[in-house]
């Protein structure tokens, strides 16, 4: 039951993505359309000056992004809840 629901949801998502891409690029060939859908170059990560959740850090230095703090026990950035 869970597998069939997952496959149905995955099929609907794929149908939505293909439909959206075909509407945005009306007169493109299917090969160009598929290359735009599965393009990886557009999703390259940006370099940032701070470290996000789960990144390793050194306690005492301010390396983590805002709203994160370096855990002295685990030595990685975690959500800062305050005291």
UniProtKB/Swiss-Prot annotation:
Residues with the Leucine amide modification: 81
Signal sequence interval, chain numbering: 1-21
GO molecular function, one term: ion channel inhibitor activity
InterPro entries named in the record: Huwentoxin-1, Huwentoxin_CS1
Localization terms from the record: Secreted
Keyword list, A-Z: Amidation, Disulfide bond, Ion channel impairing toxin, Knottin, Neurotoxin, Presynaptic neurotoxin, Secreted, Signal, Toxin, Voltage-gated sodium channel impairing toxin
Keyword flag Translocase: no
Tissue specificity annotation: Expressed by the venom gland.
Main location: secreted
Entries under Pfam families matching the protein: Toxin_12
SUPFAM superfamilies in alphabetical order: omega toxin-like (SSF57059)
Prosequence residues removed at maturation: 22-48
Annotated TM spans: none
Disulfide bonds: 50-65, 57-70, 64-77
Gene Ontology annotations for the cellular component aspect, listed alphabetically: extracellular region; host cell presynaptic membrane
More about this protein: Negative results: has no activity on Nav1.4, Nav1.5, Nav1.8 and Nav1.9 sodium and calcium currents.
Family of this protein: Belongs to the neurotoxin 10 (Hwtx-1) family. 15 (Hntx-3) subfamily.
Entry remark concerning the domains of this protein: The presence of a 'disulfide through disulfide knot' structurally defines this protein as a knottin.
Subunit architecture: Monomer.
Function field: Selective antagonist of neuronal tetrodotoxin (TTX)-sensitive voltage-gated sodium channels (IC(50)=1270 nM on Nav1.1/SCN1A, 270 nM on Nav1.2/SCN2A, 491 nM on Nav1.3/SCN3A and 232 nM on Nav1.7/SCN9A). This toxin suppress Nav1.7 current amplitude without significantly altering the activation, inactivation, and repriming kinetics. Short extreme depolarizations partially activate the toxin-bound channel, indicating voltage-dependent inhibition of this toxin. This toxin increases the deactivation of the Nav1.7 current after extreme depolarizations.
Name used for this protein in its record: Hainantoxin-III 6
Organism: Cyriopagopus hainanus
Organism classification: Eukaryota, Metazoa, Ecdysozoa, Arthropoda, Chelicerata
């Amino acid at each position: 039951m869970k597998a069939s629901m997952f496959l149905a949801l995955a099929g609907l998502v794929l149908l939505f993505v293909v439909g959206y891409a075909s509407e945005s690029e009306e007169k493109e060939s299917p090969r160009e359309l598929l290359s735009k859908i599965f393009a990886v170059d557009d999703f390259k990560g940006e370099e940032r000056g701070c470290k996000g959740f789960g990144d390793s850090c050194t306690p005492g230095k301010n390396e983590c992004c805002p709203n994160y703090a370096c855990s002295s026990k685990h030595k990685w950035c975690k959500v800062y809840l305050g005291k």
